Regions:
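Regulatory and partner-binding modules of innate immune sensors/adaptors
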Residues: 1-395
C-alpha cells in the first residue's frame, strides 16, 4: 500500500514500481483496484507511467491510458519538470511518445503537450535535438504552438532544427507565422542555416523572414558575416541574390572578414553582386592590409589583380602604413615581391612616424644582412626627389 512521505506526497507502492519497471501490465491493473495506488511517486517524482516511459514499456503505457486515473498520470510532472511525454521524448522512445501524444490530442490536453521541463525544453525541442524528424513533424501537426517556446538558452525549435540541418522540420516551422526563430548567444535560425551551408533553409528564411539576415549575434555578426567567415559561398549567393544591398554591411566590412579568412571565392561572389563593396575598416585598414597581416598570399594576389581593388596598393591605415610597410615589418617575403612588382606601388610613402617600407624591413632583420635582398631587391629603388636612397632617409 502507498504510504505518506514527509512532504505529504504518496510514495509509490513497491509492487507497482516493480510492475512498471518490468512492464507487467497485468499486475498494475490488479493494483489499480485501489484507486489511489497508481498516483504514488518515486523520490524523483516519477509515477508508474513515467517509469514505464523511461524504460519504454509500450504495452504498459497503453494499459494505463485505459484507466480512469490516466488523465492525472499523463499530466503528472516529476522533479525535472517532465511529464511522461517529455520523459519518453527526452530518451528517444518514439513509439511511446507517439502513443502519449495521440492520447493527449484526443483528450484535448494541450497544456500537457506544451509543457516545458525545468530547462525550458518542450517535447518538440527534444525530438529535434535527438534527430527524430517524423516525431517532430507529428508534434508540430498535433500542437503548432510548440513552435513558440524557447528554452533557457533562448533556443527555439526552429533554431535547433537549423543547427541539426533538418530541412523538413525547418520548412514546416517556417509555415507557422508565430513560430520562434531565436537561438543562443544572439543567434537566429538563419545564422544556423548559414553555419551548416544549408542554402535551401537559407533561401526559405529569406523568402519568409528576410529581416533575420540583418540581426547581429553577441559578437555583432549577422548571417552575412557568418557566411563570409565560414566560407559558405553557396549560401552567400542566395543571400545576395535576394538582397544585393547586404554586401554593403558595415562593422565589420565583409571584404575585410574575407581577408581575415583568406577566401578569394567569397570575395569574388561579393564583388559580383556589389562591385563597389566597402573594403576599409574603421581604423583605415583595407582588406589588403588585413590579408598581408594574416599571411593570405592568394588573397593578396587577388586584390592586386582586381580592377575594383587596385587602388588599395598605396592606401594607408591610421598609422600611415601601406600594405608594403606591413609586409616589410613582418618579413612577408613573398608578399614583398608581389607588391614590389606593381608598377603603381609607391615605395617612397612614409608612415606617421616618417618611416618608409624599406626602413621597416631593415629594422625587422639584421641590419648587416637586410632581408630586402630576398624580396626582389627593393633596398635600392630609384631615388626619391630628395636624392637619398630610400633606406637612408632621415627618420
Amino acid at each position: 500500500m502507498a504510504a505518506g512521505t514527509m512532504s505529504g506526497e504518496a510514495t509509490m507502492d513497491r509492487r507497482l514500481l516493480a510492475a512498471a519497471a518490468s512492464g507487467d501490465a497485468a499486475s498494475m491493473k490488479q493494483l489499480a483496484l485501489d484507486p489511489g495506488v497508481l498516483l504514488g511517486t518515486t523520490p524523483p517524482g516519477n509515477t508508474c507511467l513515467h517509469v514505464s516511459c523511461i524504460l519504454e514499456h509500450e504495452e504498459f503505457c497503453r494499459s494505463i491510458l485505459t484507466l480512469d486515473q490516466s488523465p492525472a498520470l499523463v499530466s503528472a510532472v516529476n522533479k525535472d519538470g517532465e511529464t511522461p511525454l517529455l520523459a519518453a521524448v527526452t530518451r528517444g522512445h518514439v513509439s511511446v511518445a507517439s502513443i502519449l501524444l495521440r492520447y493527449c490530442r484526443d483528450q484535448q490536453l494541450s497544456q500537457v503537450i506544451l509543457k516545458q521541463d525545468k530547462r525550458g525544453f518542450n517535447a518538440l525541442h527534444h525530438a529535434i535535438r535527438r534527430g527524430h524528424t517524423m516525431l517532430a513533424l507529428e508534434l508540430i501537426e498535433a500542437e503548432p504552438a510548440l513552435s513558440k517556446a524557447v528554452n533557457k538558452n533562448d533556443e527555439s525549435p526552429m533554431f535547433i532544427a537549423a543547427m541539426r540541418n533538418i530541412t523538413d522540420v525547418c520548412e514546416k516551422l517556417l509555415e507557422i507565422p508565430y513560430s520562434a526563430h531565436s537561438g543562443t548567444c544572439g543567434l537566429n535560425a538563419l545564422h544556423a542555416a548559414v553555419r551548416n551551408g544549408n542554402a535551401v533553409i537559407a533561401k526559405r528564411i529569406m523568402e519568409l523572414r528576410p529581416w533575420l539576415v540583418r540581426q547581429q549575434n553577441e559578437n555583432k555578426f549577422t548571417p552575412m558575416h557568418l557566411a563570409v567567415s565560414e566560407k559558405r559561398i553557396d549560401v552567400l549567393k542566395v543571400l545576395l541574390e535576394h538582397d544585393s544591398s547586404l554586401g554593403y554591411l558595415i562593422s565589420p566590412r565583409l571584404l575585410c572578414v574575407a581577408a581575415i579568412v583568406g577566401d578569394v571565392g567569397v570575395a569574388r561572389e561579393l564583388l559580383k553582386h556589389c562591385p563597389d563593396a566597402p573594403y576599409c575598416d574603421p581604423k583605415g585598414s583595407t582588406c589588403l592590409h588585413i590579408a598581408v597581416l594574416c599571411g593570405h598570399m592568394e588573397y593578396v594576389k587577388f586584390i592586386l589583380g582586381s580592377q575594383q581593388l587596385g587602388q588599395l596598393v598605396n592606401m594607408q591605415n591610421s598609422r600611415g602604413e601601406t600594405a608594403l610597410h606591413l609586409a616589410a615589418k613582418f618579413k612577408k617575403v613573398e608578399m614583398l615581391s608581389a607588391l614590389r612588382h606593381r608598377q603603381d606601388m609607391d615605395i617612397t610613402v612614409l608612415n606617421s612616424a616618417g618611416k618608409s617600407a624599406n626602413w621597416e624591413l631593415l629594422h625587422a632583420t639584421n641590419p648587416a644582412k637586410p632581408l630586402i635582398s630576398m624580396a626582389d631587391d627593393i633596398s635600392s629603388p630609384p631615388e626619391p626627389s630628395g636624392g637619398l636612397p630610400v633606406h637612408q632617409e632621415t627618420l
